[in-house]
């Protein structure tokens, strides 16, 4: 009798369960809310479009409502609270525990991937139809289209081959896979890109340093060359000055007066005889 009373008390407890579902608009949320309010034991249903959450309050069985929401929405539903471990404790039968264990293992196994497809999108109506029909699938979470590039990006747990078949069946369009990557692969690619960027930056910095060193060496060489030129110029100028001084001194000696005050005869400078000069070969000739 004591065990039966405990079971009744557990069944009479008011629970607030939170489920995560992709809610496209208020109409989608209302389509789930109306049948939930008719469900046995449900007292209140609230939904949050921004967080994509549905809150169900009442004397309810969490697993059954989980199944019903998946059935009505035709989408993947995640149980946020109470956690699957708590649900196992509250349930009395072994069947409910096995269902929860299966669902937790399925959630762990499911890998979220983003596939980019090339599809012909004719107009805005085609775009809306594509998104509407693809979001009906349970394994598709987010759909984005680009009319200019004629591409379709799908995020979810669906495999690429199944996605192609689903598009051909429901939308009647031929699609080609451009890329299909999981979240782990994306993270690895981002890390590789960051490493490459860092390496490129280091290489550029090293090249800049080398160029600066070369420029400094060239400038030093130029400065040394200019100093040498200045030294040579100084030597040349000193030589010319000495020659001029000597010439002036000779002139002064010739122009001095005697003791009596008589000025001697001024000797005129005469060109040297060019009879045997190499500069004028025609000087010596027979007339």
Swiss-Prot record:
Residues 181-232 are annotated as: Disordered. CDD domains: HMA (cd00371). A lipid is attached at residue 284 (S-farnesyl cysteine). It comes from Arabidopsis thaliana (Mouse-ear cress). GO terms for molecular function: metal ion binding. Gene3D superfamilies: 3.30.70.100. A metal cation 2 binds at residues 123, 126. Residues 179-235 form a coiled coil. The modification Cysteine methyl ester is found at residue 284. The lineage of its organism: Eukaryota, Viridiplantae, Streptophyta, Embryophyta, Tracheophyta. Pfam families: HMA. The keyword Lipid biosynthesis does not apply. The keyword Coiled coil applies. Residues 285-287 form a propeptide. Heavy-metal-binding protein. Residues 14-80, 112-176 form the HMA domain. Keywords: Coiled coil, Lipoprotein, Metal-binding, Methylation, Prenylation, Repeat, Zinc. This is Heavy metal-associated isoprenylated plant protein 4. A metal cation 1 binds at residues 25, 28. Belongs to the HIPP family.
């Amino acid at each position: 009798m004591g065990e039966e009373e405990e079971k009744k008390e557990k069944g009479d407890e008011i629970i607030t369960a939170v489920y995560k579902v992709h809610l496209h608009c208020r109409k989608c949320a209302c389509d789930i809310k109306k049948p939930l309010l008719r469900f046995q034991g449900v007292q209140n249903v609230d939904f949050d479009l921004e967080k994509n959450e549905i809150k169900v309050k009442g004397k309810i069985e969490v697993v059954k409502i989980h199944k019903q929401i998946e059935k009505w929405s035709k989408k993947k539903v995640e149980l946020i609270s109470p956690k699957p471990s708590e649900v196992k404790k509250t349930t009395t039968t072994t069947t409910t525990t096995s269902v929860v264990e299966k669902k937790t293992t399925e959630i762990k196994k499911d890998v979220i991937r983003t596939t980019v497809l090339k599809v012909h999108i004719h107009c805005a109506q085609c775009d809306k139809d594509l998104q509407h029909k693809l979001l009906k699938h349970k394994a598709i979470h987010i759909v984005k289209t680009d009319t200019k590039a004629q591409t379709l990006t799908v995020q979810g747990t669906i495999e690429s081959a199944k996605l192609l078949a689903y598009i051909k069946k429901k939308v009647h369009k031929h699609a080609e896979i451009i890329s299909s990557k999981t979240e782990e692969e994306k993270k690895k690619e981002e890390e590789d890109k960051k490493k490459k960027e860092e390496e490129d930056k280091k290489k550029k910095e090293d090249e800049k340093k080398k160029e600066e060193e070369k420029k400094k060496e060239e400038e030093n060489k130029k400065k040394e060359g200019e100093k040498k030129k200045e030294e040579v110029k100084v030597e040349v100028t000193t030589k010319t000055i000495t020659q001029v001084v000597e010439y002036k001194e000779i002139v002064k000696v010739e122009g001095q007066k005697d003791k009596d005050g008589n000025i001697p005869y001024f000797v005129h400078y005469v060109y040297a005889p060019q009879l045997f000069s190499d500069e004028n070969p025609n000087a010596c000739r027979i007339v």
